[in-house]
Regions:
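Anionic-ligand binding region
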Residues: 115-128
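Conserved N-terminal beta1-alpha1 strand-loop-helix module at the mouth
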Residues: 1-67
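Glycine/small-residue-rich loop that forms an oxyanion/phosphate-binding "nest" at active or ligand-binding sites
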Residues: 47-95
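Active-site glycine- and acidic-residue-rich loops that bind
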Residues: 108-116
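Receiver (REC) domain switch/active-site residues of two-component response regulators
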Residues: 27, 79, 129
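Generic structural signal for hydrophobic
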Residues: 21-22, 47, 73, 99, ...
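Structural motif
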Residues: 24, 76, 126-127
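Conserved small/polar residues in nucleotide/adenosyl-binding loops
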Residues: 132-133
Length: 133
């Protein structure tokens, strides 16, 4: 099991400072969707450059253009990127391939998925290794 800190409502500098203060106690630091919307991928980059022990998760909630969006998250320092479980299979497969190409991880967020058990099995067959409900 891994402990994850989600940071959603700070600016990127405050988020980086908080992450530095807690990184020895957590495994993953998440830059939440609100920060990414407000500050863009440079927020991921600043966090990535500010910590060295914990993984950086970019909560992008990708729906389409998945391989491109994962490549950009990785470029800015994300170790883990999120995609929505309701995205098309082709998008999820492309995101998984892109993440794995860079030795990074993809987390599939099961928000709004109606049949979680069925979708989890489908995602497992696609090669997804991290699921979140």
């Amino acid at each position: 099991m891994k402990l994850q800190l989600a940071i959603d409502l700070l600016d990127k500098e405050e988020a980086a400072k908080l992450a530095q203060e807690v990184e020895e106690y957590v495994d993953i630091v998440e830059i939440g969707t609100p920060i990414v919307i407000n500050e863009g991928l440079p927020a991921v980059e600043l966090l990535s450059k500010s910590i060295s022990k914990a993984q950086v998760l970019a909560d992008l909630k990708i729906m389409d253009a998945a391989d491109y969006e994962v490549s950009q998250a990785v470029k800015f320092g994300a170790d883990i990127t999120t995609i929505l479980g309701v995205a098309e299979d082709a998008s999820i497969k492309a995101a998984i391939e892109e993440a794995h190409k860079h030795n990074k991880e993809l987390l599939v967020d099961l928000i709004a998925v109606q049949d979680i058990e069925k979708r989890a099995k489908e995602l497992d067959e696609m090669g997804a290794c991290l699921l979140y409900t």
